[in-house]
Swiss-Prot record:
Keyword Transport: yes
Alphabetic keyword roster: Cell inner membrane, Cell membrane, Membrane, Peptide transport, Protein transport, Transmembrane, Transmembrane helix, Transport
Task of the protein: A transporter able to export peptides. When overexpressed, allows cells deleted for multiple peptidases (pepA, pepB, pepD and pepN) to grow in the presence of dipeptides Ala-Gln or Gly-Tyr which otherwise inhibit growth. Cells overexpressing this protein have decreased intracellular levels of Ala-Gln dipeptide, and in a system that produces the Ala-Gln dipeptide overproduction of this protein increases export of the dipeptide.
Record's protein name: Uncharacterized MFS-type transporter YdeE
An annotated GO BP: protein transport
Family: Belongs to the major facilitator superfamily.
InterPro entries from the UniProt entry: MFS (IPR011701), MFS_dom (IPR020846), MFS_trans_sf (IPR036259)
GO MF annotations, alphabetized: dipeptide transmembrane transporter activity
Annotated TM spans: 12-34, 44-66, 75-94, 99-121, 134-156, 160-182, 208-230, 245-264, 271-293, 298-320, 341-360, 364-381
Membrane topology: Multi-pass membrane protein
A Gene Ontology term for the protein's cellular component: plasma membrane
Lineage: Bacteria, Pseudomonadati, Pseudomonadota, Gammaproteobacteria, Enterobacterales
Subcellular location: Cell inner membrane
Length: 395
């Protein structure tokens, strides 16, 4: 990796960290903000958050697909500008509908940035560097989510608007970093006069369909597991013990990701991805079974969370590698945008968990999640066996 590429990559990783800190400082407090500022009831807040998140995901798909037609550096700058503008606008308006729309803009912009960031890495990094850098980026995201919420807690105690201003300030530095140090994507420069680009390709690629469905199921299991666990513990015990469990599970998850993500991710390659993704699935299942038997033992909750997190550590770079392998060179951002639809699985997890916990024995929740992650693994294998674009199967 030459000096220019190293600077560009470092600038993008730092930008990813700062934007995630800003998002982490605000997203957990949106319910408090809507309650205090607009006196919304709990159910209305739930509807508002769901609408905003759904709009953000849907529009980010379209904008992410369009990113393949433009310079990715400029596209990331536009996404960050929209991200910062949304936070500033929320503090200036006095209308709940506008707040929801601006929150949707924030989520859309963040998703677009994350998608184009992956595409930039795919365009410019060597095959041996991609999973290493993506693992580092995933570590940055977890560090951001570790730092952001405590900062937001401190600021919201002073003023309900301060977390939003922090997020806007955090956005200013990435704009500077990207403008100065990030080079234009070599793929865009080489193909902007005659690239072959068609969104219809997304609908015709069976491997992408299998991988997206697999990602949806995997994110349903792992994307909101902390809230899922807290719902479960509140049913079998009480709110106080649920807080203790979450206080154990989240630090264990963050510590495992920060310390192991790079060392595990850098070992992923086309030759061993099937075996490692199978091992990751097994870790998910063992962790979920461990949750069933953890009961009132915080030690068992922590140990089960550690095993569960190993599955997450393997799946994150593995899913990136799978999509990168099947995406045509001119459509990297489009493919990563389609993959991002899988995160809708995490969005519906709290709703489904609530239904399961109120209609079935509590332990059945983790049995269902174990079956879901096994289904995700089966769909992933179907995608691996597909042969897109005349390529050989991945492994």
């Amino acid at each position: 990796m030459n000096l220019s590429l190293r600077r560009s990559t470092s600038a993008l990783l730092a930008s990813s960290l700062l934007l995630t800190i800003g998002r982490g400082a605000t997203l957990p407090f949106m319910t408090i903000y809507l309650s205090r500022q607009y006196s919304l009831s709990v159910d209305l807040i739930g509807y508002a958050m769901t609408i905003a998140l759904t709009i953000g995901v849907v529009f980010s798909l379209g904008f992410g697909i369009l990113a393949d037609k433009f310079d990715k550096k400029r596209y990331m700058l536009l996404a960050i500008t929209a991200f910062a503008s949304g936070f500033i606008a929320i503090t200036l308006v006095n209308n709940v509908t506008l707040v929801v729309l601006f929150f949707a803009l924030i989520n859309c912009a963040y998703s677009v940035f994350a998608t184009v960031l992956k595409a930039w890495f795919a365009d410019n990094l060597s095959s041996t560097s991609k999973t290493k850098i993506f693992s580092i980026n995933y570590t940055m995201l977890n560090i951001g989510w570790t730092i952001g919420p405590p900062l937001g807690t401190l600021l919201v105690m002073q003023s309900i608007n301060l977390p939003f201003w922090l997020a806007a300030i955090c956005s200013a530095f990435p704009m500077l970093f990207i403008q100065i140090w990030v080079k234009r994507s070599e793929k865009i420069i080489a193909t902007e006069t005659g690239s072959v680009w068609s969104p219809k390709v997304l609908l015709q690629d069976k491997a992408l369909l299998w991988f997206t469905c697999s990602g949806f199921l995997a994110s349903f299991v792992s994307g909101a597991f902390a809230s899922c666990i807290s719902q479960y513990v509140m049913v079998i015990a009480d709110g106080d013990f649920a807080e203790k469990v979450v206080a154990v599970v989240l630090p264990v998850n963050a510590a495992m990701v920060v310390t192991l993500q790079y060392s595990v991710g850098r070992r992923l390659n086309p030759a061993n991805i099937r075996a490692l993704m199978t091992a990751g699935t097994l870790c998910f299942v063992i962790g979920l079974v461990g949750f069933i038997f953890s009961g009132n033992s915080l030690l068992l909750w922590g140990m089960s969370a550690a095993v569960f997190t190993v599955g997450e550590i393997i799946y994150a770079p593995g899913e990136y590698m799978l999509i990168d392998h099947i995406a045509p060179p001119e459509m990297k951002a489009s493919y990563f945008s389609a993959q991002s639809l899988g995160w809708l699985g995490a969005a519906i997890n709290p709703l489904v968990s609530g239904v399961v916990l109120t209609s079935l024995p509590p332990s059945s929740l983790f049995v269902i999640l174990a079956l879901v992650i096994i289904a995700a693994w089966v769909l992933m294998l179907k995608g691996i066996r597909a042969r897109p674009w005349g390529q050989p199967a991945l492994c």
